[in-house]
């Protein structure tokens, strides 16, 4: 039952997710591709996390933060992708009212936590390259733990605002969400209640997270670039550029997509373009991150070779 009579109002008890396409052939193709991407995402990020845990040479702040980015990527993708895969296999996919709220808050939590973790990684590289003598002091174990806890706390706050906003909405019908998951904007469009304080707070907080973290990353890498250009050692400059290039590639993909989905006015692009960008943001980027960070990182490649060598000769 999709609707429930409550006095003078009709309340929605479930939503219909329209998904990416109605073409049955295309649905099978997309199911296969996205399933493969999801399996690579989980296995790739888990492998990176385990490698960092078991390799003593990777027990440094940068890789500590990277392991948490991997955990968040798994969580973010898992909050949406399995549900999307089910959507490809059925004619009409419904999601319960409570399930929609859980999916919305989960995506808000993991997305916000990743923003803060990426900013934390930028600060870590800033200290390592611009203030190397103070690195061990400024990036102590206690500081690293506090930064990670702060990142997750930011995620919890945004998720709390999102779920409070969701439960404050009054859905009278229709209940068809033109998306493949319960995103905030489509739900606001379906709501028949007035925009309230919780919606405004959620919007302001989400925008503030994006602006603040981008500002931290931009300032950190401006100083990093200046410091690298001043380096006399060609080898040192090359190593610093190599590490920074991997990070900046991941950040550009992440924030470029976030900007397109949540910052660019909706009138500038179609709903289908928004869906494609969301697939890239939620499904593809979590798969690419371990590849981006690993392929140009000699420490990770070296640690992987050593672990594989141990397995071969054990």
Curated annotation (Swiss-Prot):
Extracellular side: 1-28, 79-102, 158-199, 262-274
Example GO molecular function: olfactory receptor activity
Membrane topology type: Multi-pass membrane protein
An annotated GO cellular component: plasma membrane
Keyword Glycoprotein: yes
GO annotation terms (biological process): G protein-coupled receptor signaling pathway; sensory perception of smell
Keyword Zinc: no
Disulfide cross-links: 100-192
Lineage: superkingdom: Eukaryota
Family annotation (SUPFAM superfamilies): Family A G protein-coupled receptor-like
UniProt keyword annotations, A-Z: Cell membrane, Disulfide bond, G-protein coupled receptor, Glycoprotein, Membrane, Olfaction, Receptor, Sensory transduction, Transducer, Transmembrane, Transmembrane helix
Ranges facing Cytoplasmic side: 50-57, 124-136, 221-240, 296-314
Residues listed as glycosylation sites in the UniProt record: 8, 268
Residue spans crossing the bilayer: 29-49, 58-78, 103-123, 137-157, 200-220, 241-261, 275-295
PROSITE patterns reported for this sequence: G_PROTEIN_RECEP_F1_1, G_PROTEIN_RECEP_F1_2
Major location (coarse): membrane
InterPro entries on file: GPCR_Rhodpsn, GPCR_Rhodpsn_7TM, Olfact_rcpt
Pfam assignment, any one: 7tm_4
Homology family: Belongs to the G-protein coupled receptor 1 family.
Function: Potential odorant receptor.
Protein name stated in the entry: Olfactory receptor 5P67
Source organism (scientific name): Mus musculus
